[in-house]
């Protein structure tokens, strides 16, 4: 019997059905993606087309990994998606992709490079040239209203004298309000530079005009700003820049003198300030001690000029007498010493010559009080000393003057030296020229110095330029970031730097002129990141490899018999894994709290394995080894770490723990992908404009007779990991291909054990190639071949061109396929594979390429959408039959598939071009289905509970009604013989007792449910009772133990209660019901109806129900 409060009956079959549905959906989702039961090893990367990428014609380039990159980006054996970044190149780089005998190349389009080259088309000028502008003086005075701008080409090889082609002209514009002044120059010389001059109008130095209704701006201490711009344009036939010096007052408006064509290409240079005040002569200070200070002109002087040195004393000094000595070399004449305040100071000069030097001694004595009340300056002038530059040995040099002060009875001060710059030229400024604006510090990784050449030039008043690199002095402001050579001819990093920096400064000085060189230094972020496809390596059951001297003698498997252990010198193979080293290049921002800046962005990591390959090692080489710095091979059980060592110190730049387990795994699947050619497509990356995404797709269809194709193979192990077979040594295995239909494809003698070759013979399709993977010949048993794994490859041979490729190509059309195996070139073609039952085996290459790129970038997705419109075919589903799925290995290459699978028999013809809708993937559909089923189950459960609670509340006896209940016994007779009812005879039952007979026949369960769920009104009482006596008696006793009593009830009140309990082995649900009735409705003491007449009893009960 059921207890009260149990779950309602209908929930049990509903929950069971929901459980079955959930299990079926889960099974379908897992089966659809080809995932094995052992999926705990998610560290292994999903399979992809294992092509080799190379970037050609680039000096520095890197392959990239996006942070939190979706593993499903590369999840198809037919395609591989990689992003790369070209840091430095002199010409457009070329991407090369190869696999087996096939290779394909594609030049990176210029619009994907996004270079800031404003020199014009790159077919005339070098690819990496950039134009740099320097404003020589950012302060322009009315006495010298000239602006000079030096331009030079960055990235140009200064030693390449053959690059003397006709360089373009530059036109410079200065704008102030609505007025404009222009000038021009032409790039030339080995350094590729020129100086443009602009003569500003005198009216520009007046205060700016104020329009009506506007307030007059405050005087700007930095001067009136003037914006400078430039444009690039070719010269005329003679190579001249005609009209470069033309000035016009209001030519800024477009449509005047062709300015409409140039203003759209204006490039900003910077801002200069205009000042009306005169440019006073600049003096440099030389402090001898706390009292005496010498002031000398800082500008260079010419031969024959007189230089005046001003000797001053501090205003608060109490010195009354001092002796000043000045010593000069020959070539400088000491003329005179005189004072401007003869009443304040007495001056007496003596000149003495001694060999190569001339010494002047000047005695200065105070005669009167200092004029404190007449001047507020910090220094008072004492004497002026005049020197004449008589001669000099070079065009540019310095003349030193040695100074010393002596105080009577106090001694002398230290010697101080000042320099007078001698030059026959009027220099405006110096400019350090660099090949680039930034430097990549890879010396930290390789130990090789990275240097950048430097040139320093001077510019004169007449815009003449001279190389003064050998005469300058230089110093780095922070040698922990960047260093400069002693000869100041290059800056460099040698790997001992500890940080990078934005706009690191190296100062260059020539005479009194100085100029900074700002360079951004990028350094790798430490520690480096080591990425291993599988950090736990196990032995592979059945794969025995020969033992050589550099391999450990692996312990034999305990499961192998004695025949396998005889002296063959073989041991079990360990799993292999791929290894690569990643990092980010960072640079500190300007200021003390500068945030780090990233090359590209924080979301990108650079593959630097090729840079640190020589410095990678394993701490325990006997546990595992590295092959070519990219393949990890287990040797024996243990734990070790992969380390990247610093080439310059004993420090460790990165490490990764590797475990070689004692467990054994087996090869569960051998995935086969036909490769008849390769095609490559390049797309811009939406995350960063400097990165380029490449998609290489394998061609599956053989289209010409005798065309050859190879196979790409992946191994799947019982631990869930997958690995390309290419990383294993070809000496340890061999692949043998067998054709299932020689009329379609044949298998010639393979040229390489890694790539079996198939040849097209006739049209056909299906799983026509069987590939057997066997262990090395030296480890084969004598009686039988040791086949490690078997794979079945799908082949499609269709002669003729693909109609889907007849549409014209776009900017990012796939490159041509270079089939070196068959010495052909084909356009990238899309195809389908159909099984023998007419169902589709694989999606088209475009659709699978879309699946691989689905999460790559937004821009790539949009481009692929356009490509589907042109080239997609409506025959790309994988709906193979059951029999075929049993013979084909699980296709985990589409784990999980991103493509939409068209239904078979959709009515689309083979060659129809349609726009394929891009819906949800199988994984997404499965997850949404699970979510919907769960929500439905919860909703049904809540509704069922609410329904049961509502019915229970309506049928429960009120508390006040219990007082009117009778003491009479209510009986429920449970028997298994129909004769028990008739044996009661005609004797009526006691007035206070009632017996209800429940039939347990085959149909009674359903009928009892119907009766109880309809409020307890009995429509049928069957006379056949099929039930065991033990069960009925037990249940009868149980209900006798729990009668309902009420001392206040009347004798005629009858309570009718029915309990029914279903044994566990019965198929009927358990139902509980409570029925209450008044004595006016039911009278159980019946004088006119015999108890033994069930038909009459049923009729009587029906009458009572009708009356109610």
UniProtKB/Swiss-Prot annotation:
It is a single-pass type I membrane protein. Glycans are attached at residues 316, 373. Residues 820-836 have a biased composition (Basic and acidic residues). The chain crosses the membrane at residues 923-943. It is found in: Membrane. Residues 944-1108 are cytoplasmic. It comes from the Eukaryota. GO terms for cellular component: membrane. Residues 820-857, 1022-1072 are annotated as: Disordered. Disulfide bonds: none annotated. Residues 1-27 form the signal peptide. InterPro entries: Ig_TMEM132_2nd, Ig_TMEM132_5th, Ig_TMEM132_6th, TMEM132, TMEM132_3rd, TMEM132_C, TMEM132_M, TMEM132_N. PANTHER family: DETONATOR, ISOFORM E, TRANSMEMBRANE PROTEIN 132C. This is Transmembrane protein 132C. The gene is TMEM132C.
């Amino acid at each position: 019997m059921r207890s009260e409060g149990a779950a309602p009956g209908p929930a049990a079959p509903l929950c069971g059905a929901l459980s079955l549905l959930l299990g079926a959906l889960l099974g379908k989702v897992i089966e659809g993606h080809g995932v094995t039961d052992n999926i705990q090893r998610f560290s292994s990367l999903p399979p992809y087309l294992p092509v080799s990428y190379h970037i050609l014609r680039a000096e520095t380039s890197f392959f990239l990994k996006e942070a939190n990159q979706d593993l499903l980006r590369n999840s198809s054996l037919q395609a591989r998606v990689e992003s790369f970044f070209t840091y430095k190149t002199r010409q457009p780089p070329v991407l090369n992709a190869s696999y087996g005998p096939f290779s394909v190349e594609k030049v990176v389009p210029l619009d994907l490079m996004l270079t800031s080259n404003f020199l014009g088309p790159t077919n005339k000028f070098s690819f990496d040239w950039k134009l740099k502008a320097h404003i020589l003086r950012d302060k322009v005075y009315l006495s010298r209203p000239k602006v000079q701008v030096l331009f030079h080409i960055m990235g140009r090889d200064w030693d390449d004298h053959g690059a003397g082609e006709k360089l373009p002209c530059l036109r410079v514009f200065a704008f102030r309000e609505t007025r404009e002044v222009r000038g021009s120059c032409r790039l030339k010389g080995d350094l590729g530079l020129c100086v443009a001059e602009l003569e500003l109008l005198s009216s520009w130095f007046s205060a700016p005009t104020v329009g009506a209704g506007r307030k007059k701006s405050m005087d700007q201490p930095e001067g009136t700003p003037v914006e400078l711009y430039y444009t690039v344009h070719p010269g005329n036939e003679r190579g001249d820049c005609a009209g470069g010096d033309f000035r016009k007052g209001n030519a800024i408006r477009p449509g005047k003198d062709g300015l409409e064509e140039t203003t759209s290409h204006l490039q900003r240079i910077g801002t200069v300030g205009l000042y009306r005040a005169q440019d006073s002569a600049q003096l440099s200070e030389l402090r001898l001690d706390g009292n005496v200070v010498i002031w000398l002109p800082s500008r260079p002087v010419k031969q024959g000029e007189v230089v005046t040195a001003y000797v001053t004393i501090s205003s608060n000094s109490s010195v009354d007498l001092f002796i000043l000595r000045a010593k000069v070399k020959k070539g400088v004449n000491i003329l005179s010493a005189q004072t401007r305040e003869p009443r304040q100071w007495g001056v007496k000069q003596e000149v003495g010559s001694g060999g190569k030097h001339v010494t002047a001694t000047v005695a200065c004595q105070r005669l009167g009080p200092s004029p404190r009340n007449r001047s507020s300056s910090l220094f008072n002038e004492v004497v002026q000393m005049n020197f004449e530059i008589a001669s000099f040995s070079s065009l540019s040099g310095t003349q030193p003057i040695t100074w010393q002060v002596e105080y009577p009875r106090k001694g002398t001060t230290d010697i101080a030296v000042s320099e007078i710059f001698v030059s026959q030229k009027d220099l405006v400024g110096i400019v350090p020229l660099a090949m680039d604006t930034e430097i990549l510090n890879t010396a930290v990784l390789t130990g090789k110095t990275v240097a950048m050449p430097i040139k320093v030039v001077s510019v004169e008043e007449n815009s003449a330029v001279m190389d003064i690199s050998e005469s300058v002095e230089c110093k780095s402001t922070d040698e922990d970031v960047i260093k400069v050579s002693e000869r100041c001819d290059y800056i460099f990093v040698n790997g001992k730097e500890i940080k990078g920096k934005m706009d690191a400064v190296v100062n260059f000085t020539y005479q009194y002129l100085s100029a900074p060189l700002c360079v951004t230094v990028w350094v790798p972020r430490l520690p480096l990141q080591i990425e291993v496809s599988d950090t736990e390596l196990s032995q592979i059951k059945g794969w025995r490899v020969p033992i050589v001297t550099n391999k450990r003698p692996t312990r034999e498997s305990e499961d192998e018999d004695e025949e396998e252990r005889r002296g063959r010198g073989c041991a079990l193979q360990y799993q292999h894994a791929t290894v690569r080293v990643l990092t980010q290049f960072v640079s500190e921002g300007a200021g003390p709290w500068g945030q780090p800046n990233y090359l590209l962005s924080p979301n990108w990591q650079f593959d630097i394995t090729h840079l640190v390959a020589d410095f990678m090692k394993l701490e325990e080489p006997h546990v595992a080894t590295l092959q070519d710095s990219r393949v990890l091979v287990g040797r024996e059980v243990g734990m070790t770490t992969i380390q990247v060592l610093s080439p310059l110190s004993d420090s460790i730049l990165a490490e990764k723990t590797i475990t070689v387990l004692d467990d054994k795994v087996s090869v569960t699947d051998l995935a086969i992908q036909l490769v008849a050619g390769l095609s490559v497509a390049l797309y811009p990356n939406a995350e960063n404009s400097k990165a380029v995404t490449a998609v290489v797709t394998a061609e599956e269809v053989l289209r010409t007779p005798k065309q050859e194709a190879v196979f790409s193979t992946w191994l799947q192990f019982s631990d869930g990991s997958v690995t390309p077979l290419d990383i294993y040594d070809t000496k340890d295995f061999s692949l043998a291909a067998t054709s299932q239909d020689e009329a379609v494809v044949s298998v010639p003698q393979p040229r390489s054990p890694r790539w079996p070759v198939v040849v097209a013979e006739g049209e056909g399709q299906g799983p026509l190639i069987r590939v057997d993977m066997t262990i090395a010949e030296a480890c084969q048993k004598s009686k039988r071949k040791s086949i490690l794994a078997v794979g079945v490859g799908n082949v499609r041979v269709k002669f003729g061109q693909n109609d889907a490729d007849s549409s014209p190509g776009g900017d990012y059309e796939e490159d041509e396929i270079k089939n070196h195996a068959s010495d052909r070139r084909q356009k990238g073609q899309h195809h389908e594979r159909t099984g023998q039952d007419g169902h589709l085996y694989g999606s088209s290459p475009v659709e699978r390429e879309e699946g691989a790129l689905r999460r790559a970038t937004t821009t790539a997705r949009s481009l692929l959408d356009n490509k589907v419109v042109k080239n997609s075919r409506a025959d790309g589903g994988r709906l193979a039959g059951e029999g075929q799925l049993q013979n084909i290995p699980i296709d985990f290459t589409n784990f999980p598939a991103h493509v939409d699978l068209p239904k078979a028999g959709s009515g689309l013809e083979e060659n129809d071009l349609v726009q394929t809708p891009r819906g949800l993937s199988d994984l997404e559909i499965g997850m949404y289905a699970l979510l919907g089923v769960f929500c439905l189950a919860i909703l049904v459960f809540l509704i069922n509970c609410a329904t049961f609670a509502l019915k229970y509340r309506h049928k429960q006896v009120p508390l006040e009604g219990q007082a009117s209940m009778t003491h009479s016994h209510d009986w429920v007779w449970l028997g298994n013989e129909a004769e028990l009812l008739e044996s009661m005879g005609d004797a009526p039952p006691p007035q206070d007792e009632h017996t209800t007979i429940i039939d347990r026949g085959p149909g009674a369960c359903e009928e009892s449910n119907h009766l109880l769920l309809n409020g307890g009104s009995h429509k049928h009482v069957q006379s056949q009772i099929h039930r065991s006596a033990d069960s009925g008696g037990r249940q009868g006793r149980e209900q006798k133990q729990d009668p309902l009593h009420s001392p206040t009830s009347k004798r005629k009140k009858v309570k009718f209660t029915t309990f029914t309990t279903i044994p566990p082995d019965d198929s009927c649900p358990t139902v509980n019901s409570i029925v209450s009735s008044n004595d006016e409705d039911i009278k159980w003491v019946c004088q006119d109806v015999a108890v033994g007449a069930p038909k009459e009893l049923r009729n009587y009960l029906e009458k009572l129900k009708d009356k109610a």
